[in-house]
């Protein structure tokens, strides 16, 4: 039996499937482009291997392609009966999450990590602003997030992806001095990680280093595909710093090319929230925002989020509609 990059057994005998699956996980954790095609290569090499089907379904969910989730998830469930207990538990937990069964999924995820703390595809669900903790709305979630990442340090502390997430958890509770060496170590191992670069930008912001932050993230994104899951959002950071420094031409240029509908290639929640928030911040800074820009993002919000239910999206949609 083969293993993934975390030395966990995976149920395939195909070296090509193993290599492609490992590559898919790496791309997923780095918010890189080509996640779907890489998992599809693993499937092509061994269609009976359940986890690439699951990874593809999870990517579709993250990308906002909800209609595409069901088929690969069903295939993963059909195939995993003969796999290892860890793989079976991973399919169960992520399946609950993708079906919108949040409380059941969270219970399954925490139980899974108690037994398999190096299962990053499960740990990832509870990391960052959009994770199950950060997106929960619970009071004290920042401290809860740090407690969660801290519990995994003995198991994943030397991993570049985990280091980026632990650094962000430290930032969120104001422990910037502790976060800096952690994110620097992460980026030293994988300097092209979208998650790492994004969190490094947050550290620049928290330290009040606007010029250095803009220079860093603007240069970094030059080599980042627009298909990357975080391209829209790191571009938002560029536009926001350009606004702060009074470079309105750059702000509008980046917004139109890489953040707003028609320019960005990103999950709809990022396009809508980043565009609405940037327009609002421009107005707060005393700049005129043409009405047609607000109309365009209002129309996009109506199209992609026609019903309320996601508080983060709803608040930004309200800005767009105001």
Region locations from a protein language model:
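Residue at a conserved register position within TPR or TPR-like alpha-solenoid repeats
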Residues: 27, 60, 96, 130-133, ...
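Residue-level recognition of tetratricopeptide repeat
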Residues: 16, 47-52, 85, 117-122, ...
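Alpha-helical repeat scaffolds
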Residues: 40, 68-80, 103-116, 139-154, ...
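TPR-adjacent "capping" and linker segments in tetratricopeptide-repeat scaffold/adaptor proteins
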Residues: 2-19, 76-87, 301-309
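"A position-specific structural signal for the A-helix of alpha-solenoid helical repeats
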Residues: 15, 22, 55, 87-95, ...
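Helix-coil-helix junctions within alpha-helical repeat/solenoid scaffolds
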Residues: 242-322
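Inter-helical turn/loop elements of alpha-helical hairpins
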Residues: 23-40, 44-103, 130-142, 207-210, ...
């Amino acid at each position: 039996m083969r293993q993934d990059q975390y030395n966990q057994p995976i149920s395939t005998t195909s070296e090509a499937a193993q290599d492609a699956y490992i590559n898919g996980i790496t791309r997923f954790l780095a918010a890189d482009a080509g996640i779907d095609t890489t998992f599809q290569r693993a499937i092509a090499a061994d269609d009976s291997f359940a986890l690439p089907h699951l990874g593809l379904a999870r990517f579709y969910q993250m990308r906002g392609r909800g209609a595409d989730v069901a088929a690969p998830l069903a295939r993963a469930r059909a195939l995993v009966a003969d796999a290892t207990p860890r793989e079976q538990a991973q399919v169960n937990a992520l399946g609950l999450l993708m079906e919108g069964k949040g409380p059941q999924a969270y219970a399954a995820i925490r139980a899974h990590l108690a037994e398999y703390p190096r299962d990053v595809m499960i740990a990832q669900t509870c990391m960052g602003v959009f994770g199950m903790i950060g997106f929960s709305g619970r009071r004290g979630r920042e401290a809860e997030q740090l407690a969660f990442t801290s519990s995994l340090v003995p198991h994943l502390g030397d991993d570049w992806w985990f280091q980026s997430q632990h650094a962000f958890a430290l930032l969120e509770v104001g422990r910037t001095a502790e976060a800096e060496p952690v994110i620097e170590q992460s980026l030293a191992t994988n300097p092209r990680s979208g998650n790492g670069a994004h969190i490094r930008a947050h550290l620049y912001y928290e330290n009040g280093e606007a010029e250095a932050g803009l220079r860093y993230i603007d240069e970094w994104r030059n080599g980042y595909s627009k298909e990357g899951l975080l391209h829209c959002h790191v571009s938002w950071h560029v536009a926001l710093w350009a606004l702060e420094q009074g470079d309105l031409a750059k702000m509008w240029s980046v917004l139109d090319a890489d953040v707003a509908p028609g320019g960005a290639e990103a999950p709809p929640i990022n396009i809508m929230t980043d565009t609405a928030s940037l327009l609002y911040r421009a107005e707060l800074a005393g700049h005129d925002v043409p009405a047609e820009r607000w109309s365009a993002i209002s129309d996009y919000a109506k199209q992609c989020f026609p019903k309320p239910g996601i508080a983060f999206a709803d608040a930004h949609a309200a800005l767009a509609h105001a």
